[in-house]
Amino acid sequence: MAKQLNFSNESREALEKGVNFVANAVKVTIGPKAKNVVIEKKFGSPDIVRDGSTVAKEIEIENPIANLGAKLIEQVASKTKESAGDGTTTATILTQKMVQEGLKNIASGANPMELKKGMEAGLAFVLEKLSSKSISLSGSDIQKVATVSAGGDEEIGSIISKAMDIVTSDGVITVEESQSLETELDITEGMSFDRGYSSPYFVTDQERQVCELENPKILITDQKISTLVDLVPILEEIQKAGSPFLILAEDIEGEALTTLVLNKNSGVLNVASVRAPLFGERRKAALEDIAILTGAKLISEDKSMTLDKVSINDLGKAKKITITKDKTTIVAFEDTKDLVEARVEKLKREVNITESEYDQDKINERIAKLAGGVALIKVGAATETEMKYKKLRIEDSLNATKAAIEEGVVSGGGQTLIEISDDLLNLSETSSDDLRTGINIVKEALLEPTKQIAKNAGFNGDVVVAEIQRLNKGFNANSGQYEDLKDSGILDPTKVIRLALQDSVSIAAMLLTTEVAMADIPEPEAAAPGGPGGDPMGGMGGMGMPGMGGMGMPGMGGMGMPGMGGMGMPGMGGMGMPGMM
């Protein structure tokens, strides 16, 4: 495809347009008086959101070069969201300001590479100061952080605080939709481990990139699976039962993985596979723990057990399994509670007789996973649109609270960034020329989150920042007062701020040092059938035989390659059957 190229200032200005387009839509979502963004959906009702990452992902710009800028800043939001779970709007605001200030200076003759060095030096200074100002999160502050992160919603803050208190910070907390109008907290058996799906083709929710299985059957084995021949009998039983199916194995690869993916995508099986967690003997122990939790029999080579002998009675079960690219969460049924408690007691006895401190720590980790359980936050609302909105807020708040427990908190409302901005003056004055300018770009950007929080609350951002610097107090956008934000419980997770800073400087510096922007030239839309000079009938499509499905594994009825539809009349694709045995 032909490419459109922009050079030098022209390329950077086009990229800046894309950055501004996205950032201006995103930054209305920051602070306790943030505004909502309504997003049209192709199907169903529109979404109403107050989440920077969600807004950024939905934006496409007609100009292909400007759209590159939009995608760069969307990358900032998504990367911060992925790493910290929150802080996407802060990262977007910081990036926009750095890009704007950087391009002004480049247009005035500044060297982009020197600006980049100055920005990176400024970032290193800021991160050091941020770490020194961070304080550990005490138990009473958890609800405050959760409430602030939920936009001041005290109900959400209270529910998350209760969930954290019950399952602890190491426990599993999941958010799901409820059939009722009320948002409730439910504690059940379950656990999570750090392994994701074997293939992204198992994903059931494309927007969230998550695979969810309701009431699945579970095969657990310490064997490596590279062919499905031995699994044919149990797969046939699963297909007849119509149950979702999870395979948890040492590894699943090659022909076995390919065949599962093909049958998943053709609708023959609702299946997913996950590699077993940990390594060596600890992997086997972890599989035994999961087997007890789910009521499964561990199919182990040590016991001379083979996969071709597996029956439906050897499989485990769960209420729900949620799999992301790097994590699996199991919500178990209550009928295994006694077995789990017995397993925990056995592990506690092992701790007492184990001399190795390292082994004791590993066993205690297993105890925490088994005993912690799963906290289910069931989100209730009057409408589907409100439920989606509320669920997003709870997920953001939960992620921010976990981040706060990991690395501590600092004064919120952007106050800490303003204080560090003042400290940057000393570093700036000892630097020279464009290096100093790069540091000042970071310095100015640190003021922007507070300015936007104030603006969204109906105040003048410049005036608010000046008052914060004069009074040495933070600005409470809810009350419009200047006060000690730590005493008021307005706290930001240090991890969220750190990652927002790192991601924003990274993308802004790359954009400022860009000399050429290249994008595909959009192809003109094809003329509609029956248009001027065309055949009014629009042409007849070629007729073809329906495609024949691929061959599946022997003995597996209905399993195999999906059929490929033949060519037909315009708008009428040929029907293709799934491969028959």
Curated annotation (Swiss-Prot):
This is Chaperonin GroEL 1. Its EC number is 5.6.1.7. It is found in: Cytoplasm. It catalyses: ATP + H2O + a folded polypeptide = ADP + phosphate + an unfolded polypeptide. One of its GO terms (molecular function) is unfolded protein binding. Residues 523-542 are annotated as: Disordered. Together with its co-chaperonin GroES, plays an essential role in assisting protein folding. The GroEL-GroES system forms a nano-cage that allows encapsulation of the non-native substrate proteins and provides a physical environment optimized to promote and accelerate protein folding. Its main location: cytoplasm. Belongs to the chaperonin (HSP60) family. GO terms for cellular component: cytoplasm. The keyword ATP-binding applies. Gene3D superfamilies: GroEL, GroEL-like equatorial domain, TCP-1-like chaperonin intermediate domain. ATP binds at residues 29-32, 86-90, 413, 492. PANTHER family: 60 KDA HEAT SHOCK PROTEIN, MITOCHONDRIAL. One of its GO terms (biological process) is protein refolding. Pfam families: Cpn60_TCP1. Forms a cylinder of 14 subunits composed of two heptameric rings stacked back-to-back. Interacts with the co-chaperonin GroES.
